Every structure is written in structure tokens, then in C-alpha cells.
């Protein structure tokens, strides 16, 4: 069994902003145990039209393929010992529960370097799984380079099924999306405020 790590250049407005700010070629990292690359896990937005509200999610390939144009990716393969495989199966099985206490760390993604308990960005989650801290996607990319198995357009590996049933495609609209964003940041700030007193929500 192997762990597959995918760096992607997403065709979203937020993805473009991140790449311009960081100077990186890619702006997102996703993980999977599926050799067919049809479903991933990551920390990212819940729905397409609310970019700063998210958590620990499942990412069907359609999330990357639904927009027109190529989807540049780099994919890496890491062989896993049996005990690590079992641990990752259990960890990945927890993805997709929107009621979970695990949140997307929008504050760190935007401005801060603090680690807020129970919160991750896609990069910090990959760091957590790999057991090594990476400060940028470029640093992660360099570390994984010897394990690359593919570089190019994701469409050459995975076909868009046309399925749009994933919650990602259920738009919230401006008013509800704005309210979701206010609530999300309020929770993050509250956690940050009591960070030294609260119990960490462990991922492992």
C-alpha cells in the first residue's frame, strides 16, 4: 500500500491569489490511499463560493476537474509500512464530517504563523501526516521530488465523471456565505484566545 500526495494548481480565484502571493507554481496539497486517484482528503473550503470556510474534507477528483482548462499537478508515491497504512486508513476515514471540531485554519492561511488547536491548512495537515514540518509548498515539493510518479494535467489520469453531488457544489450565496465566514472566524479567534488553556483536539 502507498500514500499518494498531489500538489495541484487549482483554477479558482483563491488559488490564483495564493500563487501570486507565494510565488509557488502550486497552491494546494491533497492526500489519498486510492491508487486510482478518484478521491482525496485535505483541509480546504466546504463549498465553492465560500473560500475561507472549511475543514477536514473529502475531495472527489471532480473538485479539480469541473472547471475548464488543464489542471497542472505533481503526484508523489510513498510506500507505507502496514502499521502506518492502518493508521492513515483510520485518519482518512474521519474526513468529510462537517460537524467535526476540526477546522480549516484560515487565519494561518492569511496572516498568522500560530498553530490553532484542532485546525490545519492543507500544508500543515500534510506535514502532520508526514511527520515533518514544511513552511511552504515549495519546501514540501522539493522534499517529495525523488518520489514523483507524474507531472502534468490531471485530466490525463482521471476522467471527470460529471457527478456534481459533492457538497462542494451546493452554493451558499452571498448572505449565507458571509454569515458562515463570520462564524468561522469567530470560532478561530476564540480558539486562538484560549489556546494555552484548552485541550488540543488530536488528529492522531
Language-model-derived ranges and their functions:
Residues 1-204:
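Cysteine-nucleophile amide-bond enzymes
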Amino acid at each position: 500500500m502507498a500514500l499518494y500526495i498531489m500538489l495541484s494548481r487549482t483554477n479558482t480565484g483563491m488559488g490564483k491569489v495564493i500563487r501570486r502571493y507565494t510565488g509557488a507554481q502550486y497552491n494546494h496539497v491533497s492526500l489519498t490511499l486510492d491508487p486510482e486517484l478518484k478521491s482525496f482528503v485535505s483541509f480546504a473550503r466546504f463549498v465553492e463560493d465560500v473560500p475561507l470556510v472549511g475543514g477536514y474534507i473529502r475531495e472527489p477528483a471532480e473538485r479539480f476537474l469541473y472547471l475548464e482548462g488543464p489542471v497542472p499537478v505533481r503526484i508523489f508515491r510513498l510506500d507505507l509500512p502496514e502499521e502506518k497504512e492502518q493508521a492513515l486508513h483510520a485518519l482518512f476515514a474521519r474526513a468529510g464530517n462537517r460537524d467535526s471540531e476540526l477546522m480549516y485554519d484560515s487565519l494561518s492561511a492569511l496572516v498568522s504563523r500560530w498553530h490553532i488547536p484542532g485546525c490545519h491548512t492543507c500544508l500543515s495537515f500534510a506535514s502532520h501526516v508526514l511527520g515533518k514540518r514544511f513552511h511552504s509548498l515549495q519546501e514540501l515539493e522539493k522534499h517529495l521530488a525523488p518520489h514523483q510518479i507524474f507531472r502534468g494535467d490531471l485530466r490525463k489520469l482521471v476522467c471527470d465523471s460529471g457527478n456534481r453531488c459533492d457538497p462542494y457544489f451546493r452554493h451558499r450565496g452571498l448572505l449565507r456565505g458571509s454569515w458562515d465566514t463570520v462564524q468561522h472566524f469567530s470560532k478561530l479567534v476564540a480558539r486562538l484566545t484560549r489556546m494555552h488553556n484548552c485541550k488540543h483536539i488530536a488528529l492522531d
